[in-house]
UniProtKB/Swiss-Prot annotation:
<dbReference type="GO" id="GO:0007173">
    <property type="term" value="P:epidermal growth factor receptor signaling pathway"/>
</dbReference>
<feature type="disulfide bond">
    <location>
        <begin position="85"/>
        <end position="94"/>
    </location>
</feature>
<dbReference type="GO" id="GO:0000165">
    <property type="term" value="P:MAPK cascade"/>
</dbReference>
<feature type="topological domain" description="Cytoplasmic">
    <location>
        <begin position="131"/>
        <end position="152"/>
    </location>
</feature>
<feature type="transmembrane region" description="Helical">
    <location>
        <begin position="110"/>
        <end position="130"/>
    </location>
</feature>
<dbReference type="GO" id="GO:0005154">
    <property type="term" value="F:epidermal growth factor receptor binding"/>
</dbReference>
<feature type="domain" description="EGF-like">
    <location>
        <begin position="55"/>
        <end position="95"/>
    </location>
</feature>
<comment type="function">
    <text>Promotes the growth of epithelial cells. May stimulate the phosphorylation of EGFR and mitogen-activated protein kinases.</text>
</comment>
<keyword id="KW-0812">Transmembrane</keyword>
<dbReference type="GO" id="GO:0001525">
    <property type="term" value="P:angiogenesis"/>
</dbReference>
<keyword id="KW-1015">Disulfide bond</keyword>
<dbReference type="GO" id="GO:0030297">
    <property type="term" value="F:transmembrane receptor protein tyrosine kinase activator activity"/>
</dbReference>
<dbReference type="GO" id="GO:0007166">
    <property type="term" value="P:cell surface receptor signaling pathway"/>
</dbReference>
<dbReference type="GO" id="GO:0005886">
    <property type="term" value="C:plasma membrane"/>
</dbReference>
<keyword id="KW-0245">EGF-like domain</keyword>
<keyword id="KW-0325">Glycoprotein</keyword>
<keyword id="KW-0732">Signal</keyword>
């Protein structure tokens, strides 16, 4: 048993070492599938930029005042200036201020919670009272204790 575990650990270690090494062998697809595959031999020289950087660049000087509350960027595919709004602003030109609103908790909510908890406790106490009362009635002995008086 211990020998099997030792062999399994050694095989796992060798597999991990081969997978992590840069000299791992790449096996090409079978000859039947090779005609449909194309290989890129310059994978190490190719660096792909993020997609977001390909589409927009900073605006020209004539568009600098286009965005009211944000940074201007020029989208090459749309061929127009777009705005990246600062926090709290929205709109095509960042012209709308998003107001943060705060709701004040009303006392009605707390009153409703208090009434609900009170009803729940009352129901629990009523069930407990009924259970204790039924138990006390069942504890009474069904036999009558006679004290040596008259015979039956």
């Amino acid at each position: 048993m211990a020998l099997g575990v030792l062999i399994a650990v050694c095989l796992l270690f060798k597999a991990m070492k081969a997978a992590l090494s840069e000299e791992a062998e790449v096996i090409p697809p079978s000859t039947a599938q090779q005609s449909n595959w194309t290989f890129n031999n310059t994978e190490a020289d190719y660096i792909e930029e993020p997609v977001a950087l390909k589409f927009s660049h900073p605006c020209l000087e004539d568009h600098n005042s286009y965005c009211i509350n944000g940074a201007c960027a020029f989208h090459h595919e749309l061929k127009q200036a777009i705005c990246r709004c600062f926090t709290g602003y929205t709109g095509q030109r960042c012209e709308h201020l998003t107001l943060t609103s705060y709701a004040v908790d009303s006392y009605e909510k707390y009153i409703a919670i208090g009434i609900g908890v009170g009803l729940l406790i009352s129901a629990f106490l009523a069930v407990f009272y009924c259970y204790i009362r039924k138990r006390c009635i069942n504890l009474k002995s069904p036999y009558i204790i006679c004290s040596g008086g008259s015979p039956l």
